[in-house]
Amino acid sequence: MAANSGLDSKVEYYRLQENEIISAVSSEDADQNDAGFRLSTIHLHLFHGLKFAALLFTVVPVFIILDSMKIIFQRKRRFCLDHVNRSFLRQSSWILDERICQYVLNPLFVCLYPSTFSSPTYVKCNIPIEDQKSPENNIFQDHQLNAPKIVSTKFYQYVMPEGFDPTTDPVLVFYHGGGYALKLTPTSFSFLNNMRNAFPKMAILVPDYTVTATDDQSKKYPLQILQNVAIFDYVVKTMGCKNVVIMGDSAGGNAVLNIVLYLRKCHREIYPKKVIAISPWANATFFHEGEKEYMQGTQEWDGLCLKSHSMFGRMFVGNNPNVDFTSDPFVNIEKNFETKMWQDILKKCSVMITYGSDELLSFQNKILAKKMSDASEGCNHFTAKNVLVEHQGYHTGPILNYSRNMDRWTNIPSIARILEFMQS
């Protein structure tokens, strides 16, 4: 949120450190504390920045070379530059830890936001009493989660076409990935720009939910779910948008599926028109029997590794030993799939799931797609056309395709299917 002008550095410091001011402190002491806090933060940025740079420019190149040689000599596939890109993404994710996300990558990504992100829209939402009292909404029924009753968040207008009519024109709300731990990465900008060119009359909004790369338990699950629902509510209620498409990749795929699940659990009437989950994070903390072994085999072709997947899962839920996250339907959507809930959801909005056959998450996504298909049996709301399995595709492949040639981009099979679904 934007800083209040009436708050001085003393108040800001204690708000960060203690969440409340217990006693009055002299201005001189506050200035010293504030300076010490800034120095400590700078030290952390420098230390973890140097650590990340050292690993990125020493360890990562070595493993990229080893991965490339392995492909060439084993001859399982024809070697191409795409394999180098996957290896770079995979090895880069392998060297990540919570501090690198918090003190290096997230500040860097924010600095790289395009000029169109200069004026965010802030949203403050009081969670409806009906949501809090719904017996099906475990976020509030499980009091150990300490779910907030008021949430604040923001979103950016990536593009707002001139003369946009919220009652008829489409709006795409794009929930970015990154394991809920990372800010919007620059790799998404090319995809969003191509979407803008493909649909000139479509507005594109990008939510900026709170990331989990922090020790603060209050910034872990379920905050992100509530923030994402708050953005959707703002779009349909305050902005009055009727033709809403919500899309997300990886953790963003988890987000868009959780939004409609939350709406159903709270017996809401307004749903998005379409939901597109690209390589959705269907289970954040749960692994099926044999799934880890499967992931260890598929990760050699993917851009994501098992180590980072597990790390993001731990960061998402945080340290709350009083909660069984394994059985939480928002944390592990596929594992706790509620057929009746999704039958109702699929009658109210169209859902599309895409993933690649080379993906680390393909095991859980295949099961999720099958469960959705079974839930829609006899209704034809979720058919084979709603599932795209890209042959030898990797994690969030459609988002990571950097082509600026619109003719070439729109003819990529995965992109073409997504565009067709949006236009249907």
From Swiss-Prot:
The keyword Transcription regulation does not apply. GO terms for cellular component: cell periphery; endoplasmic reticulum; endoplasmic reticulum lumen; endoplasmic reticulum membrane; lipid droplet; membrane. Gene3D superfamilies: alpha/beta hydrolase. Residues 67-424 are lumenal. The active site is at residues 250, 395. The chain crosses the membrane at residues 46-66. Glycans are attached at residues 85, 283, 401. Its EC number is 3.1.1.-. InterPro entries: AB_hydrolase_fold (IPR029058), GDXG_lipolytic_enzyme (IPR050300), Say1-like (IPR019436). It comes from the Eukaryota. Pfam families: Say1_Mug180 (PF10340). One of its GO terms (biological process) is response to toxic substance. It is a single-pass type II membrane protein. Required for the deacetylation of acetylated sterols. Involved in the resistance to eugenol and pregnenolone toxicity. This is Steryl acetyl hydrolase 1. It comes from Saccharomyces cerevisiae (strain ATCC 204508 / S288c). The gene is SAY1.
